[in-house]
């Protein structure tokens, strides 16, 4: 489905690519940001190293599971609602992680983060496919992929700060 870019996005093309890249990098960024804080979180919650590892496993399980469905949901309900619901759910889950009083709560909220963050990756690629012709889509995907690769490099620095 090729839609006209001018009806979908009124700003410059690079701003759309930047927005889609940020949405796409949210998943890997949210993993690598909190890993440097493992020991501090474990100490604050009285958690064992195995329990802390479960927070990562729960996130990745939710992320992998919902990657199967975000595309179908975006096809059924539209790209924008799926991204917005994903961002709202991710924001609520992030607040829940920050306010967790024990490791069980943290695991639950990390699972919710994983369930929601895949929307950015899956739907951003669908948007590129929808509105750009194949030759332009390759360039936009290259820009998005650069950010996707930079996120794991920047995240530990920010998380350890």
Model-predicted regions and their roles:
Residues 1-27:
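Cytosolic juxtamembrane N-terminal segment immediately preceding the first transmembrane helix
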Residues 23, 85-89, 93, 109, ...:
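Residue-level signature of the transmembrane alpha-helical cores
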Residues 32, 60-68, 152-153:
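Residue-level signature of mid-helix packing/kink "hotspots" within the transmembrane helices
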Residues 37-64:
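Extracellular/periplasmic helix-loop-helix junction of adjacent transmembrane segments
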Residues 46, 78, 99-105, 116, ...:
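Helix-breaking motifs and short loop linkers at transmembrane-helix boundaries and internal kinks
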Residues 65-104:
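Conserved MFS/SLC helix-loop-helix module at the cytosolic interface between two early adjacent transmembrane helices
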Residues 111-148:
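Cytoplasmic helix-loop-helix junction between adjacent transmembrane helices
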Residues 151-160:
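Small-residue (Gly/Pro/Ala) motifs that create kinks and tight helix-helix packing interfaces
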């Amino acid at each position: 489905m090729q839609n006209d870019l001018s009806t979908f996005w009124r700003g410059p093309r690079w701003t759309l690519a930047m927005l889609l890249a940020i949405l796409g990098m949210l998943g890997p960024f949210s993993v690598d940001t909190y890993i440097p804080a493992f020991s501090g979180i474990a100490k604050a919650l009285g958690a064992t190293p195995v329990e802390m590892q479960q927070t990562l496993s729960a996130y990745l399980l939710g992320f992998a599971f919902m990657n199967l469905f975000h595309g179908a949901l975006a096809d059924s309900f539209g790209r924008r609602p799926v991204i917005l619901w994903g961002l709202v759910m991710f924001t609520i889950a992030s607040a829940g992680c920050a306010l967790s009083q024990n490791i069980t709560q943290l695991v639950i909220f990390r699972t919710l983060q994983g369930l929601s963050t895949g929307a950015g990756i899956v739907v951003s690629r669908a948007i590129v496919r929808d509105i750009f012709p194949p030759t332009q889509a390759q360039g936009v995907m290259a820009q998005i992929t650069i950010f996707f690769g930079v996120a794991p490099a920047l995240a530990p620095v920010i998380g350890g700060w």
